[in-house]
Swiss-Prot record:
InterPro entries: Peptidase_A8. It is a multi-pass membrane protein. Its EC number is 3.4.23.36. It catalyses: Release of signal peptides from bacterial membrane prolipoproteins. Hydrolyzes -Xaa-Yaa-Zaa-|-(S,diacylglyceryl)Cys-, in which Xaa is hydrophobic (preferably Leu), and Yaa (Ala or Ser) and Zaa (Gly or Ala) have small, neutral side chains. Belongs to the peptidase A8 family. This is Lipoprotein signal peptidase. It is found in: Cell membrane. Keywords: Aspartyl protease, Cell membrane, Hydrolase, Membrane, Protease, Transmembrane, Transmembrane helix. GO terms for cellular component: plasma membrane.
Length: 201
Protein backbone atom coordinates (compact mmCIF):
# COMPACT_ATOMS: atom_id res chain seq x y z
CA UNK A 1 0.00 0.00 0.00
CA UNK A 2 1.41 3.37 -1.04
CA UNK A 3 1.89 5.95 1.64
CA UNK A 4 0.33 9.38 1.42
CA UNK A 5 2.45 12.05 -0.20
CA UNK A 6 3.29 14.45 2.62
CA UNK A 7 2.26 18.04 2.38
CA UNK A 8 4.72 20.89 2.66
CA UNK A 9 8.03 21.57 0.92
CA UNK A 10 9.02 17.88 0.88
CA UNK A 11 5.78 16.70 -0.73
CA UNK A 12 4.21 16.92 -4.17
CA UNK A 13 3.51 20.61 -3.67
CA UNK A 14 7.23 21.28 -3.72
CA UNK A 15 7.41 19.89 -7.26
CA UNK A 16 4.77 22.29 -8.62
CA UNK A 17 6.10 25.82 -9.17
CA UNK A 18 4.11 28.70 -7.74
CA UNK A 19 2.65 31.42 -9.94
CA UNK A 20 5.54 33.71 -9.03
CA UNK A 21 8.11 31.04 -9.85
CA UNK A 22 6.39 30.24 -13.16
CA UNK A 23 6.38 33.91 -14.17
CA UNK A 24 10.03 34.24 -13.14
CA UNK A 25 10.93 31.49 -15.62
CA UNK A 26 9.18 33.24 -18.53
CA UNK A 27 11.64 36.11 -19.29
CA UNK A 28 14.59 33.82 -20.17
CA UNK A 29 12.33 31.73 -22.41
CA UNK A 30 10.83 34.77 -24.09
CA UNK A 31 14.28 36.26 -24.60
CA UNK A 32 15.39 33.06 -26.32
CA UNK A 33 12.27 33.22 -28.52
CA UNK A 34 12.98 36.87 -29.35
CA UNK A 35 16.60 36.14 -30.26
CA UNK A 36 15.63 33.08 -32.34
CA UNK A 37 13.17 35.12 -34.41
CA UNK A 38 15.72 37.90 -34.81
CA UNK A 39 18.36 35.39 -35.92
CA UNK A 40 16.06 33.97 -38.61
CA UNK A 41 15.22 37.44 -39.97
CA UNK A 42 18.87 38.55 -39.84
CA UNK A 43 20.08 35.42 -41.64
CA UNK A 44 17.46 35.73 -44.38
CA UNK A 45 18.25 39.42 -44.82
CA UNK A 46 22.01 38.94 -45.09
CA UNK A 47 21.79 35.92 -47.41
CA UNK A 48 19.30 37.56 -49.78
CA UNK A 49 21.37 40.76 -49.93
CA UNK A 50 24.53 38.82 -50.76
CA UNK A 51 22.70 36.96 -53.53
CA UNK A 52 21.19 40.19 -54.86
CA UNK A 53 24.59 41.89 -55.07
CA UNK A 54 26.09 38.83 -56.75
CA UNK A 55 23.43 38.17 -59.39
CA UNK A 56 21.70 41.52 -60.04
CA UNK A 57 23.06 44.49 -61.95
CA UNK A 58 22.35 48.05 -60.74
CA UNK A 59 19.70 49.73 -62.83
CA UNK A 60 18.66 46.53 -64.61
CA UNK A 61 15.41 44.96 -63.42
CA UNK A 62 14.64 41.25 -63.67
CA UNK A 63 10.96 40.45 -64.11
CA UNK A 64 9.16 38.17 -61.65
CA UNK A 65 5.56 39.05 -62.54
CA UNK A 66 5.65 41.31 -65.57
CA UNK A 67 6.66 44.86 -64.67
CA UNK A 68 4.71 44.76 -61.41
CA UNK A 69 7.07 42.60 -59.36
CA UNK A 70 10.77 42.72 -60.22
CA UNK A 71 14.23 42.15 -58.80
CA UNK A 72 15.80 45.63 -58.83
CA UNK A 73 19.14 46.28 -57.14
CA UNK A 74 19.50 49.71 -55.53
CA UNK A 75 21.69 51.20 -52.79
CA UNK A 76 19.62 53.04 -50.21
CA UNK A 77 21.11 55.74 -47.99
CA UNK A 78 17.81 56.30 -46.17
CA UNK A 79 15.48 54.37 -43.89
CA UNK A 80 13.07 51.55 -44.68
CA UNK A 81 11.48 51.80 -48.14
CA UNK A 82 13.95 54.54 -49.13
CA UNK A 83 12.62 57.15 -46.70
CA UNK A 84 14.77 59.92 -45.14
CA UNK A 85 17.62 59.64 -47.61
CA UNK A 86 20.58 61.85 -46.76
CA UNK A 87 20.43 61.17 -43.01
CA UNK A 88 22.37 57.92 -43.02
CA UNK A 89 24.47 58.44 -39.89
CA UNK A 90 21.45 59.68 -37.92
CA UNK A 91 19.46 56.60 -38.94
CA UNK A 92 22.40 54.42 -37.92
CA UNK A 93 22.45 55.90 -34.42
CA UNK A 94 18.67 55.57 -34.11
CA UNK A 95 18.76 51.93 -35.19
CA UNK A 96 21.57 51.25 -32.71
CA UNK A 97 19.46 52.75 -29.94
CA UNK A 98 16.49 50.60 -30.97
CA UNK A 99 18.61 47.46 -30.79
CA UNK A 100 19.89 48.37 -27.31
CA UNK A 101 16.34 49.14 -26.14
CA UNK A 102 15.02 45.80 -27.40
CA UNK A 103 17.75 43.90 -25.57
CA UNK A 104 16.82 45.77 -22.38
CA UNK A 105 13.12 44.93 -22.81
CA UNK A 106 13.98 41.34 -23.66
CA UNK A 107 15.33 40.74 -20.15
CA UNK A 108 11.88 41.53 -18.71
CA UNK A 109 9.81 40.04 -21.51
CA UNK A 110 6.86 37.83 -20.55
CA UNK A 111 4.51 38.00 -23.56
CA UNK A 112 5.27 35.62 -26.43
CA UNK A 113 3.51 37.97 -28.87
CA UNK A 114 5.77 40.82 -27.82
CA UNK A 115 8.72 38.47 -28.28
CA UNK A 116 7.55 37.86 -31.86
CA UNK A 117 7.14 41.56 -32.65
CA UNK A 118 10.37 42.64 -30.99
CA UNK A 119 12.25 39.77 -32.62
CA UNK A 120 11.09 40.88 -36.07
CA UNK A 121 12.12 44.47 -35.36
CA UNK A 122 15.47 43.43 -33.89
CA UNK A 123 16.32 41.15 -36.80
CA UNK A 124 15.37 43.79 -39.35
CA UNK A 125 17.20 46.59 -37.56
CA UNK A 126 20.35 44.52 -37.21
CA UNK A 127 20.15 43.44 -40.86
CA UNK A 128 20.19 47.03 -42.05
CA UNK A 129 22.80 47.99 -39.43
CA UNK A 130 25.17 45.42 -40.93
CA UNK A 131 24.96 47.37 -44.18
CA UNK A 132 25.33 50.72 -42.39
CA UNK A 133 28.53 49.61 -40.68
CA UNK A 134 30.20 47.43 -43.31
CA UNK A 135 29.12 48.61 -46.77
CA UNK A 136 30.34 51.56 -48.83
CA UNK A 137 30.85 54.45 -48.70
CA UNK A 138 31.98 54.38 -45.03
CA UNK A 139 31.19 53.00 -41.56
CA UNK A 140 27.99 54.51 -40.09
CA UNK A 141 27.17 55.83 -43.57
CA UNK A 142 26.96 52.59 -45.53
CA UNK A 143 24.14 52.25 -48.04
CA UNK A 144 21.58 49.49 -47.50
CA UNK A 145 21.03 46.92 -50.26
CA UNK A 146 17.43 46.82 -51.55
CA UNK A 147 16.37 44.45 -54.28
CA UNK A 148 12.61 43.76 -54.41
CA UNK A 149 10.23 46.09 -56.25
CA UNK A 150 6.44 45.71 -56.14
CA UNK A 151 4.39 48.13 -58.22
CA UNK A 152 4.66 51.75 -57.11
CA UNK A 153 6.09 50.79 -53.73
CA UNK A 154 9.74 51.75 -53.10
CA UNK A 155 12.33 49.00 -53.51
CA UNK A 156 12.93 47.11 -50.26
CA UNK A 157 14.65 44.12 -48.66
CA UNK A 158 13.75 41.43 -46.12
CA UNK A 159 14.54 43.67 -43.15
CA UNK A 160 12.13 46.47 -44.12
CA UNK A 161 8.79 44.59 -43.96
CA UNK A 162 10.02 42.70 -40.91
CA UNK A 163 10.50 45.96 -39.01
CA UNK A 164 7.16 47.37 -40.20
CA UNK A 165 5.12 44.23 -39.45
CA UNK A 166 6.79 43.88 -36.05
CA UNK A 167 6.01 47.51 -35.19
CA UNK A 168 2.37 47.13 -36.28
CA UNK A 169 2.05 44.02 -34.11
CA UNK A 170 3.36 45.90 -31.06
CA UNK A 171 0.93 48.77 -31.67
CA UNK A 172 -1.99 46.33 -31.89
CA UNK A 173 -0.88 44.56 -28.71
CA UNK A 174 -0.65 47.89 -26.88
CA UNK A 175 -4.08 49.00 -28.09
CA UNK A 176 -5.71 45.78 -26.88
CA UNK A 177 -4.01 45.92 -23.50
CA UNK A 178 -1.20 43.39 -23.82
CA UNK A 179 1.97 44.57 -22.05
CA UNK A 180 5.41 43.11 -22.71
CA UNK A 181 6.10 42.31 -19.06
CA UNK A 182 2.77 40.76 -18.00
CA UNK A 183 0.79 37.62 -18.82
CA UNK A 184 -2.48 38.28 -20.66
CA UNK A 185 -4.33 41.57 -20.94
CA UNK A 186 -3.98 44.32 -18.40
CA UNK A 187 -7.14 45.18 -16.46
CA UNK A 188 -8.83 48.47 -17.17
CA UNK A 189 -8.69 51.07 -14.41
CA UNK A 190 -12.43 50.89 -13.77
CA UNK A 191 -12.22 47.10 -13.40
CA UNK A 192 -9.47 47.46 -10.81
CA UNK A 193 -11.44 50.13 -8.94
CA UNK A 194 -14.55 47.95 -8.94
CA UNK A 195 -12.59 45.00 -7.63
CA UNK A 196 -11.16 47.07 -4.78
CA UNK A 197 -14.63 48.27 -3.80
CA UNK A 198 -15.92 44.70 -3.78
CA UNK A 199 -13.05 43.62 -1.53
CA UNK A 200 -13.77 46.44 0.92
CA UNK A 201 -17.38 45.33 1.41
Amino acid sequence: MMGRVPDGPTGLAALVPSVEEAQAMLPPRRLRLLLSIAAVVLTLDIVTKVLAVKFLLPGKSVSIIGDTVTWTLVRNSGAAFSMATGYTWVLTLIATGVVIGIFWMGRRLVSSWWALGLGMILGGAMGNLVDRFFRAPAPLRGHVVDFLSIGWWPVFNVADPSVVVGAILLVVLSIFGFDFDTVGRRKAEFDIAGQRKAEQR
